[in-house]
């Protein structure tokens, strides 16, 4: 009986560590930005994953993931409840279901560690990279809350231009494993100082790599290609945005914001689907804007909803107005259409089966089709803008296919009003900052209710509009030329390193087996 109670006490303690460390992992991300919490959280995950009892290890890793994702993506319930018509209880239940699914990946991480009795420090980031790849790929993927994003303001941030956020995440797990090993050794008597020194050298190596990258000049600013850009933040409430009677008020708001800056700035940028009406249905409005913008010498970039009747597609698009080389028309080639759509938000999988089940599967504008994966950059004032709409900015590898050496800026437009005053928009902004650092390109981010910002090529916010205010934000943005290693090679380097480490471990295990195999 005493043995059973002791065992239960140990199991409960392990579960507590899992839940606690999962929760504090969220504090590493915006808006909290305590980047050191990423290492504390992963230390907890490694601890529970290496628990002697396999079943406890698996369930503990699942609880870690459940706690981490439940608190980290709780903002999903806002759109489900407020705009999907579901009750508060149902919306939170759906968040738990999503979190439980995402928790399967940390559980898989623990399973692989238990299955192959992993003790090698190098294998922890390799396995984590594999499970994170699956999370970002299966069922269209949901690569939200990768720990690499949390390091945007840390000393390890400059690994991003070399390896991307996947690589930064790899090194965060590696450093966490090194710290775990270091703490384990320090608690053992007599201490193995050679192991301590080896661990410290590994930490120095990762830090040195980041320091080297911070000094490297992968890109350079082109001062004579700068642009004076104005962001128009309409602050249209999401519950009013799609009401037909509110359309004219929305048109008035953006007409006013545009008029204030016509002729005074190079470019005015409006957010994703700025006007809640088909672009096709208000052609006189757009033709009028085209004429006024062209006369004033200011170009307008705007998110629209476009019906491509030739291809029979409803597209989430970005267009330009006032461009003399690409005069506006419905058939203009100077258009970007969103490729990666959000399941249930922009399209409904198994539509004929799910839509009849309830309003939660009938969010406004959830019937879009995809644009092409690779598209030409938008040409604005003879500058090249590689575009990403809303969720697409979190997909570094997709954006990499469209960011070229002669790309001047990255443009992202969004409507984060779907998520209210939750932490979701801040996490979204943090990922946009990482894209700037990865590619060495300034990011211009225009949103409906915030957070509208200008981000420099180092991933730093240089100008920011207040959230939930109808306003404009103007800033001179300097273009950059050149490419970072990540822009050229993508995730190839970090996947190659993972494969190399995996082969080295396999080869080492084979050698040990041969050496200690009894001879007949």
Swiss-Prot record:
Superkingdom of the source species: Bacteria
Q: Which intervals hold domain CN hydrolase? A: 232-479
> What GO cellular component is one of the record's annotations?
plasma membrane
Which keywords does this chain's UniProt record carry? Acyltransferase, Cell inner membrane, Cell membrane, Membrane, Transferase, Transmembrane, Transmembrane helix
Please cite one Gene Ontology biological process associated with this protein. lipoprotein biosynthetic process
Q: Which NCBIfam families match?
A: lnt
The protein's job, in short, is: Catalyzes the phospholipid dependent N-acylation of the N-terminal cysteine of apolipoprotein, the last step in lipoprotein maturation.
PANTHER family, sorted: APOLIPOPROTEIN N-ACYLTRANSFERASE
The protein, known as:
Apolipoprotein N-acyltransferase
Q: Native species of this protein? A: Pasteurella multocida (strain Pm70)
Gene (UniProt): lnt
